[in-house]
Amino acid sequence: MLTGSITAIVTPFKNGEVDYGAFERLIEFQIQNGTDGILVCGTSGESPTLSYEEHEAVIEFAVKSAKKRIHIMAGTGANSTEEALRFTTFAKAVGADSALLVVPYYNKPTQEGLYRHFSKIAKEVDIDIYIYNIPSRTGIEISVDTLERLAKDHKNIKGSKESTPNMDRISEILKRIPNFTVFSGDDSLTLPMMSLGAKGVVSVISNVMPKEIKEFTSYALKGDFEKARDMHYYLLEIFKIMFIETNPIPVKTALSLMGMVKKEFRLPLCEMLPQNEEKLKEVLKKYNLI
């Protein structure tokens, strides 16, 4: 079972192209610091601005670079079922360990439509699937009833990434769905979710502090919530600053300040406001990251 700290890794660019040299160094940085898994082509990986070919190439490169030393979760979701099926089939073929599929966005399907979307992919691709619930970005939320139905009907639907502050929802999922793994999708909500029984976090912060996020989740998994709470408050300031602007703008800027990637985005994402970058620098200095 996948548990602990999963880094939602950024996709570095250089002169408009994916910077595979920097990407390989980022993967090694995660492995050397004990991270449990890496999510590629998620929100933090700027997947909406990757071409189909780039999306697949990034997944394949991550799998090959990892060399089975770390779990690779491929972001394969889309608001077209056929597109999501294409990416998920590819991820399985090149050796990804699991797939994260976002709830289809913009077209706002019904719960029955959501069921059929995930059901089709789970039937056709034999890979562990995690459903990504992030209503603030998708405009729709998959219900607990639909998650329960999917988990009952498809043994390869293993869990969900929950980017929601609704702890009643988390409680309902964990109470009603046996052997279903929940990951926090928000660093600052990791502690409350794990106290309810979530098994870890898909983390933005672990791009820059992988060792600390691993330590944080390890305490919670062992039931040592006093130490986990201490870590939560220690990390709280960096949790906040990394979302001063839209993710992944601050975390990629932080990595550039640390000398790990170029400060390069693809439109419509762009560089931080200068005053916000100064605030970010001050926090990074407090944590001795720059």
UniProtKB/Swiss-Prot annotation:
Pathway where it operates: Amino-acid biosynthesis; L-lysine biosynthesis via DAP pathway; (S)-tetrahydrodipicolinate from L-aspartate: step 3/4
Gene3D superfamilies the UniProt entry points to: Aldolase class I
Protein's name in the database: 4-hydroxy-tetrahydrodipicolinate synthase
Keyword presence, Lyase: yes
Family: Belongs to the DapA family.
Marked site (Part of a proton relay during catalysis) residue numbers: T43, Y106
Xref: HAMAP family: DapA
Transmembrane segments: none
Subunit structure comment from the entry: Homotetramer; dimer of dimers.
A Pfam family that the UniProt record links to this protein: DHDPS
